[in-house]
Amino acid sequence: QHRYYPYGATLTHILGYVSKINDQDKARLIADQRLNEYVGTSNIGKLGIERFYESTLHGMPGYEEVEVDSRGRIVRQLDQYPPQVGQDIYLSIDLKLQQYIEKLLNGRRAAVVALDPNNGEVLALVSSPSYDPNLFVGGISGTDYNALLTNPNKPLFNRAMQGTYPPASTVKPFIAAAALTEGVITRNTVIHDVGWWQLPNTDKRYRDWKRWGHGRVDVIRSIESSVDTFYYQIAYDMGIDRLSKWMTEFGFGDRTGIDISQSEESRAIMPNREWKFQRYEQSWLQGDTIPVGIGQGYWTATPLQMANALTILINNGKSYTPHILLNTKSSVIGPEVPEISVPMESTLLNTVDAKSWQAAKEGMYKVLYGSLGTARHVFAKTPYQAAGKSGTAQVYGLKADEVY
């Protein structure tokens, strides 16, 4: 059968595609001792769900063993192995939500990830712009492939899982929860922000986004108004060792474990002393720590990592592995085939007390509805309640020194 993707570019960065088996695929099948399963088969899953669940979707070819005479005529049947049809798989993706997000983005370079915090199901994963996977099924032409490769908007690049960007101020609620737990700050800690913070014993100053400052600021206000100086001080007091350790607990610096090939998901960077020395053969400096407090410096994250970290905060430390598969079922009537369901794996970041989680959430609520919230105008008239965190950072593109 010829694989056809009816929704075109809408689901490409989730589903991936199938295409002709090449030498690299054959080498992998030989290594896995599965080449015999592809007798008479020309296509194989190359990316996304098609690749990750290839063995589930593919099935097994059938054949029979017969005895023949000297003229090649069949004398008798020795054995028969009927073909096994691949299983149907059911995904967690909300197609209408996926299409709605894609419509809002309208081809702009962006990524959106929507997770269900109750179980880790991926409801939408959009990387814009995308491309039509049907181009690859029968073998893509050189002209079409070159057009995709040279497109300045990089449609082949999965921004949601491979794009690494400074998480910027979106991480302030996580840092606040960690600092409260560590005793670096309390709910009553107040600073007076004059628009900058100075590294002790130096003349180095780090600016706040609000040049004239925010005045008196506590932890709730620091999230509501995204006060940079509050987090410069936290970063200085915590140090990179504790800061990096805590953010690793939220999943930064590692793959999420989503059911798509590891080669399609970036670890991004949660910097620490060891990382900098391995990367640059340089020691970690105190000045390197300060921008990490506002999600910048060497720190990068994928949109999927950021969504995953948020679900951990929402659940007071409970973590579910993001997953796209709901279950599988036999696609034919006949002998029962075992169904596969994704286990709801969860862990508990139980070192954070309930009051610290609540402070982070209260600050995020005020981002949207507080009188000084950075996103108050966007959510002022919504018929529902929500919480969130804004973040702005300079982002470097795929080409060296290209800013967009």
Positions of the model-derived regions?
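Short hydrophobic alpha-helical segments used for membrane anchoring or interfacial signaling
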Residues: 112-117
